[in-house]
């Protein structure tokens, strides 16, 4: 029996401690990314306003790409987790090798799409004075896509084994290097040239390369990974494994991409209302990221645990982990949400001096609290489905929840009904809760089918 699963039995009533042990390192790693986003925005914004605007456009584009790319690589986790639970660790190396090739090919597809977009940047209605800033920053970010693919592959492999601390330390180290690099290259410190936005891009590229190398280095030198290292190097590519990775990866990529695109389109709709609502919306998106990193981190831990128990054919524990993960997410949302709710009249002032913005933020925080139930539900059971390798239905469910229900409802309430930004935000709880309930019902249906 693997050390990670020795103490796990169907008699165990709850799995909170084990979920936290795997989930907290994921959350800490993601917290570093959020802090990096704050630092990037702060440093670029203090250098110049046009650079901040240019960075916002490019970062939104690459954010959508990286969310989708990461979603594709998620296909590896249930494969590794199932084999680990079955104690068939001798098969893991071949799966990782095939996943690496599939992930690199997918990275090339994303890169090609971004090259096409780069060649058409002048046609998407951006101010001419920003294009000279956007283009070099875009190219430097483009150079990092495949390195992120390497990092994602190694992360999902190690996460599948329950080794989530490795990626946590790599991400923390990469973020520290990025912040220091920003300081040196944006402002021209210690004899380096003052590169502004381009310096921020170069710093990001270097940190992503080092993160990828750190993960590969851990695999190649770590004492605990000798068996996997040998199997990865000696194994061969197979059509069946390559197809399996694509079968599991693309639905998750599409599901996460649609979720991200729906929020981006909501931001566009808020922009139609003017500067004040858009500023309030940006404050709320920043706040919601803090909830996101906790909910998604715990949900990722749940997917790992569920895949392990699927390998052991312990379906009682599969169900218990899913619902324990949901309860933990609700508890975290409550613990984080209570101080945010109590400080709702002060929080807007931390970000902006405008009283209208602060009033909008105070009201929108109430809606943010309401949609935490639906957000926790959909993160939990989307990852539970990922853990049991049932991912195709999520594409349809995400399309229905976000593009058939949430976006049209937000538009209808916001504009024809005259509720403005409040109407757009009222739609979020509906879309997220409906998505979560569809995922939950599908999880129960698939699990009952497997149990028979």
Language model regions located:
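Transmembrane helical elements of multi-pass membrane transporters/channels
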Residues: 21-40, 140, 174, 207-211, ...
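Hydrophobic residues within alpha-helical transmembrane segments
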Residues: 24, 28, 58-61, 101, ...
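Short runs within selected transmembrane alpha-helices of multi-pass transporters and secretion channels
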Residues: 73, 77, 141-159, 167-175, ...
